[in-house]
Amino acid sequence: MQRDQVIVVKLGTSVLTGGTDKLDKAHMVELVRQCCELKKQGHHVILVSSGAVAAGREQLLKPCGRSVIDKQMLAAVGQGQLIHIWQSLFALYGVNVGQMLLTRADVNDRERYLNARDTLNALLNYDVVPIINENDAVATSEIKVGDNDNLSALVAILANANKLLLLTDQEGLFTSDPRTNADATLIGEVSDINDELRQLAGGSGTNLGTGGMATKLQAADIARRAGVEVIIAKGAGKNVILKCMSEQLPGTRFLKLTAPKEGRKKWLLAGPKSSGQIVIDAGAITALQTKGASLLAKGVTNALGAFERGDLISVINSDKQLIARGLTRFSSSEVNKIKGAHSKQIGELLDYDGGAEVLHRDDLILL
């Protein structure tokens, strides 16, 4: 096994509570022991920890509603309690922890993304275990990542991680729902995430948590495209974290793509929300996917939404399937003026020469 790997471990609410409404501190100790064993082997460990709402509910010792405001209040109460528990448990092994609370806004902006990356790397360089959660107490719908599965994928990209372990209450990804079908079998390895797999994943979650298997599959797809191997496994399994680093691999393993993206394209994959969409024709799709070409106006059929030059947009086909993401060199109104036009016509159509490419190949990433 390669030493000095960066391992992101995502612990869902169901793992930390054991399916109850309280944190299972005995199991948390066991998870900490395994993380510290990885550190002894020379690896860096990052925890993406759910459980703030559950900790807040336990701390208040009274019933609370389940509205957004109630959950944000519980997160505000519970986040301090949660980090205190992690700090106490890691201290048993002489390991320091550091807290980072993130929102989508921290990765939308390139400068903030780089600052978050530098802070994360500094914690690892000082042999500190970062404990990361979304800033649920203040995050609004516009800046929320939405679930810690996708947050952990973004963290794995930030940290340039080798592995992402998504620990849950399920053994992994099955051929059908094992809770309703006794004949369901575990899928041991996945090399490509397609529509059939997405259907298998469904969309279940727990009352205390926000993530089901569908969000884990989405997170796995993001991370593997950035060159991160992903494993979905049952968090209650004996030595599950250590086994994920051995040949006794539990759960479902998602193979990383053979060519990890460079830093700028990782950011395009991980961070910003798309401001709009550009629809392209079959010829443009072929040029992007087989020739590594830039997107020219001639291959564009429509621009959807309102976006400005420099915004991140999604590139889709006529069936609304996602083809790529990238930084546009024209606004939505300009794209609709030049769509279908030859490059030499752009200056005349816009009264200025903005260049031939709607998206330059250096500013886009294929999906």
UniProtKB/Swiss-Prot annotation:
| Intracellular or extracellular location(s) | Cytoplasm
Provide one Gene Ontology biological process annotation: L-proline biosynthetic process
Q: Which domain of life is it from?
A: Bacteria
Which residue pairs form cystines in this protein? Answer: none
A single cellular component GO annotation: cytosol
Q: Which residues form the PUA domain?
A: 275-353
Pathway it works in? Amino-acid biosynthesis; L-proline biosynthesis; L-glutamate 5-semialdehyde from L-glutamate: step 1/2
Q: Per the record's keyword annotation, is Cytoplasm included, yes or no?
A: yes
Q: What is its EC number?
A: 2.7.2.11
Catalytic reactions on record: L-glutamate + ATP = L-glutamyl 5-phosphate + ADP
Positions with a binding annotation for ATP: 10, 168-169, 210-216
- Residues folding into a coiled coil are none
Supply the enzyme class, top level.
transferase
Q: Which UniProt keywords apply?
A: Amino-acid biosynthesis, ATP-binding, Cytoplasm, Kinase, Nucleotide-binding, Proline biosynthesis, Transferase
Question: Which positions does UniProt annotate for substrate binding?
Answer: 50, 136, 148
**Entry's PANTHER family?**
GLUTAMATE 5-KINASE (PTHR43654), ISOPENTENYL PHOSPHATE KINASE (PTHR43654:SF1)
Family per similarity comment:
Belongs to the glutamate 5-kinase family.
Q: What does this protein do?
A: Catalyzes the transfer of a phosphate group to glutamate to form L-glutamate 5-phosphate.
Put simply, this protein is called Glutamate 5-kinase 2
Native species of this protein?
Pseudoalteromonas translucida (strain TAC 125)
